[in-house]
Amino acid sequence: MDDDGLLLNFAAPDSNASSKSSAQKPVKVSGGRWKDRRKLQLSLSGRGRNKRAETGVNKESIAQPRDFSSSKPQSFREEQLAKRPKYFESRGEGGKNETYVSSLFTSNTKSKLENEKVEEEKTYLPSNAPMKGADDFNGLGLNDNLVHHLTESLRFKNPTQIQKSVIPSLLSTSRDLFVKAQTGSGKTLSFLLPILHKLMQEKKNPITRESGVFAIVLVPTRELANQIYGVLETLTRCHHQIVPGIVIGGEKKKSEKARIRKGVNILVATPGRLADHIENTTSLDLSQLRYLILDEGDRLIDLGFEETITKITDTITRCSRISESTQKWQGLPTKRVNVLCSATMENNVEKLGSIILNNPEQISIDTSKSREGDEIDSKSMAPAQLTQRVVVVPAKLRLVTLSAVLKEVAKTAPTSSTEIVRTIVFFSCSDSVNFHYEAFKRNGSEFRKARNAETNRFEMVTVGEDEANAEGSDTEIPKISSAPTISANSVVYKLHGSLTQQVRTSTLQSFVQAVPFDNSENNYNHLILLCTDVASRGLDLPNISSVVEYDPPFSVQDHLHRIGRTARLGNKGSSYLFLLPGIEEGYVDGKIRVVHPEGSIRITNYETILQNAFGDSSEIKKSDPKSKQGKWDMHATTWHLDIERWLLEDAASHESAKQAFTSHIRAYATHLSSEKTFFNVKTLHLGHLAKSFGLREPPKKLGSLATKSSSTRKEYGEKSRKLEDPRKKMLRMAKLAASSASSEFNY
């Protein structure tokens, strides 16, 4: 039988089936923890979890890099590699104590403002200069002795435009005045001269110090009060019967009471201290007050003195007895004349004017017109002869660029020791002033004012280390030191509201007065004042060649008052405004261009400033033709690294730098809401900004260190302070509260 095509089927046992049957049987595991036994039991039964590969947001394995070869052509990959930067900043764990050393010239944001090429520099006639060819002070109707003293002793030749407008008005009428004029135009003399003229004209019943107070000048800051008082002392030398006086916060009230008790005719005061004397000094007689002058009215409002001023004026009105003495002093006004001086006519100033002034006469010399032809009445203008330079600097390069600007100004200082060049640098907070003062005076000598026994003249003598560290020196000796990190001929000062009044006054006097230094090796003829806005209002500082706004102003009016310290009374001047790349660049066209004459703003490249300051002209590509001229970038980097190493070695200076950094951020966040478009704290690169303070720590660590002072002291090996005795602390706080109860806003 043929069996071809016959198929036989055999049922063989399936191995999978046998395994399934065996797997269905539970596996018993004993010993160990329950969790471990359960995991082992599940794994043996085939029910364990499958480990998934770790993936990123694009579902690609993190362990294996993505392969671009299949999706992108070779030419595209080569093009992308060519676009990559050659240098990268370290983003690892950092060095010792988690610090980072980054390059100054990498990862910087570039400026979008183009450097303006000026083919022919425009020249403007000075807008605040004395009027040449106009009538002199004799033509204004002033007292002959006063005019002779002005022209012969004080060397005033011609009045300014604002003086020519205000003086005749105060002499002829008794109307209240609202005076608006740009800074540096001579407003102080415009209201002091008519008052002195009226008091000097009383021949029948001469004015003496016992006659009472006839004029009060209210000012916002103590420095401005001291300056006006100094001008009054100079003017009254031609008529000793008229006695000026001053009452300001920070001085001893007992001494002020004694001066008031002896008699004062013209009183210069700050609002808080004057209100205190009105309440507590019975010898202060304001019944014959004829003139009330409010200088820098906009600043008085900004500092919150509106309520205090209203209270002062109400008290003066209530105790006035002018009607009883009109026959005795017939040349004086028959009612009180109020004068409000301000750089702007904003709403808050107009509100103060409506409270203080009664049917006032408005005098303004600002007739500038905008580009559209509309007259600008609400804003003051910068002096026409001022050159405004805008420097857009990356955050990391701010400190080294500031030193370069000061080096450049120091090079322009004359070689003669009699000619002195002065520069003012404005900061946003006092902590920043302290840090930069310590940074610039590093390895320098401190000075103080002393009388030479041989010549009987004052000069600046070197302060010894023991004297500088002596107890009480911080409250008595002004902060003056040489600045070898800038130049051999530079001297640096510091001024802010946290200093005592004695130090503030002596610092300003030393900065203004040309006192020779006892060190004959160096010709210290470049004086640098590091300050806050406490020195931006009304101060008439001579020979200010340059003003540097290192931190942007908080308003356009602050900008005008800052730059108004230079280019005064027709003299030329220059100012620098530091801005960061990005949204801050819009501040030029958005805010300040309208208050500057057309063509007076210069966009300056920071690299050009660094090249001029750190480039060595004697080394011009001698051996290496590829090297930059003078290797200015290497010199700038070395200068900045020296600052960083100094902070690492000096724990106190390092703490000062951290405090300055955090205070700078807080101050930056307080810009007006109308300017948040240009100054937004959220757009700051805090790491790069910390670099400009010489810090190597990341900002997050700086913030944590600022809140942990005890750990900071342990880290740098400082001894922890002993707890203060509760009784001594209570007495100290009571004395502090008593001394500051009537003091001014610590600005």
UniProtKB/Swiss-Prot annotation:
UniProt-annotated location(s): Nucleus, Nucleolus
Residue window of motif Q motif: 135-164
UniProt cross-references to Pfam families, sorted A to Z: CTE_SPB4 (PF13959), DEAD (PF00270), Helicase_C (PF00271)
Keyword rRNA-binding among record annotations: no
Residue ranges constituting the Helicase C-terminal domain according to the UniProt record: 401-626
UniProt miscellaneous comment: Present with 1460 molecules/cell in log phase SD medium.
Organism: Meyerozyma guilliermondii (strain ATCC 6260 / CBS 566 / DSM 6381 / JCM 1539 / NBRC 10279 / NRRL Y-324) (Yeast)
Top EC class, one word: hydrolase
GO molecular function terms listed in the Swiss-Prot or TrEMBL record: ATP binding; ATP hydrolysis activity; RNA binding; RNA helicase activity
CDD domains cross-referenced by the UniProt entry: SF2_C_DEAD (cd18787)
Gene3D superfamilies registered for this protein in UniProt: P-loop containing nucleotide triphosphate hydrolases (3.40.50.300)
Enzyme nomenclature, EC number: 3.6.4.13
Free-text note on domains in this protein's UniProt record: The Q motif is unique to and characteristic of the DEAD box family of RNA helicases and controls ATP binding and hydrolysis.
UniProt record similarity statement: Belongs to the DEAD box helicase family. DDX31/DBP7 subfamily.
Protein name listed in UniProt: ATP-dependent RNA helicase DBP7
Highest taxon of the lineage: Eukaryota
